[in-house]
Regions:
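Intein-associated homing endonuclease modules of the LAGLIDADG/DOD-type, together
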Residues: 1, 24-34, 39-276, 319-367
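Protein maturation boundaries and topogenic segments
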Residues: 1-23
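Intrinsically disordered/low-complexity terminal segments and short unstructured peptides
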Residues: 7, 79-80, 276, 286, ...
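A short beta-strand micro-motif
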Residues: 8-13, 28, 50-53, 284
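Polar, glycine-rich mid-to-C-terminal structural blocks
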Residues: 280-313
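Extended catalytic core of nucleotide-activated donor transferases of GT-like folds
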Residues: 315-317
Length: 367
């Protein structure tokens, strides 16, 4: 029966959990992103294991008999195992020009957290991308008045943005939440209390998305992504949709956020010239092998640019992710299998990869 390497993080309705820590009656996600209970677990040591690499940067280590639902190139869907795919090779054609095995990309997931968020998700997204906090104000750098006005309406109290001279920097003078009729500005302590310490912004290279936002409701996560994309997202002529910033952790957090919304994406690095030095930037490329990317923007100029491209290139959406490499490890590895309360016997593993549980029946051929 198939199993996954211990230590692999499994997304659950309350956050990620190492697979070996999951218990009967705990919940994971099925392939549609809905919570589903665990009926059984088992752990054992396997003499060999296999690491599968996917084209969008995801990877996972499994036992040799781990079962997969695969769409084979130029063929229908089949059921196969990690060992079978390794033995036959993942590339096909005379010159090995294409990848033979593809898995269906995950759907958006539904976390169970109902905790109130201290800052509106859209505003937080803009702040993480283009904002900073001072002693008595929040500043956002943007050439798009649309973004500034939207943030103004979503602040704890709608307040008028002020521009720093002839620059593109706009600041909001946040007033104390305890004296609504007072003109006294909040102190730095109160500002940190309002935004919560982990959200106060300092260096852009150190920004990250707080955990409560990554496991918030579908609507909140989408609003957060929209704030980040309206501020630091780009749509290129070739149809690429990119999020760019200088924080590695923010890039990884954004990648997790996007994948939880049902998008396929991967991270690239780029050294951006800055006077005499080169600043390392992180680019998250959101591929067309995923959901409707137009939902990620509300800023009209970016949204219309993407809609214009999608309208001219009405290529059928391909929500499948190719397996590009499989590596075998000939050493003992502890693995854990799950039995899921689902008719399809599927759940989402690390990075929301759809995978079969240990009870799925295996047979070669079409299903």
């Amino acid at each position: 029966m198939g199993a996954i390497k211990n230590g692999t993080m499994i997304p659950t309705p309350t956050g990620n959990v190492p697979i070996e820590n999951l218990k009967v009656n705990d919940y994971v996600f099925d392939e549609s992103g809905s919570p589903v209970s665990i009926l059984g677990t088992f752990t054992y040591e396997t003499p060999t294991s296999y690491k599968l690499y996917f084209k969008d940067g995801r990877s996972i280590i499994t036992s040799e008999d781990q079962i997969w639902s695969i769409r084979k190139k130029y063929a229908s869907h089949i059921i196969t195992t990690s060992l079978d795919m390794f033995s036959k090779g993942v590339q096909g054609g005379r010159k090995k020009k294409y990848y033979k095995y593809l898995i269906l990309n995950n759907k958006s997931v539904h976390f169970s957290s109902q905790s109130p968020l201290p800052v509106d998700p859209y505003v937080l997204g803009v702040l993480l991308a283009d904002g900073k906090t001072g002693q008595t104000e929040v500043t956002i750098s943007s050439t798009d008045k649309y973004v500034i006005d939207k943030c103004s309406k979503l602040m704890p109290r709608e307040n008028t943005p002020h521009c720093w001279g002839n620059t593109n920097s706009w600041y909001f003078k946040l007033r104390t939440p305890y004296h609504s009729h007072s003109n006294r500005l909040v102190s730095n302590y109160q500002l940190k209390d309002l935004l919560k310490d982990q959200i106060v912004l300092h260096k852009h290279s150190e920004n990250f998305i707080p955990e409560p936002y990554l496991i918030s409701s579908l609507e909140s996560r989408l609003a957060l992504a929209q704030g980040l994309m309206d501020a630091n997202g780009s749509v290129f002529n070739a149809g690429s949709v990119i999020f760019q910033n200088s924080s590695k952790q923010l890039a990884l957090d954004f990648l997790a956020l996007i994948r939880s919304l049902g998008y396929s994406a991967y991270v690239l690095t780029y050294k951006f010239p800055n006077k005499k030095t080169h600043v390392l930037n992180y680019l998250v490329n959101i591929t067309r092998r995923s959901s409707d990317r137009t939902k990620l923007f509300t800023l009209p100029r970016k949204l219309n640019r993407l809609k214009d491209y999608e309208g001219k290139h009405k290529k059928r959406l391909i929500p499948y992710i190719p397996i590009v490499k499989i590596q075998r490890y000939n050493q003992p590895t502890k693995v854990t299998g799950l039995i899921i309360n689902s008719d399809n016997h599927m759940f989402l593993a690390d990075n929301f990869l759809p995978i079969h549980d240990a009870t799925a029946s295996y047979k070669k051929g079409v299903f």
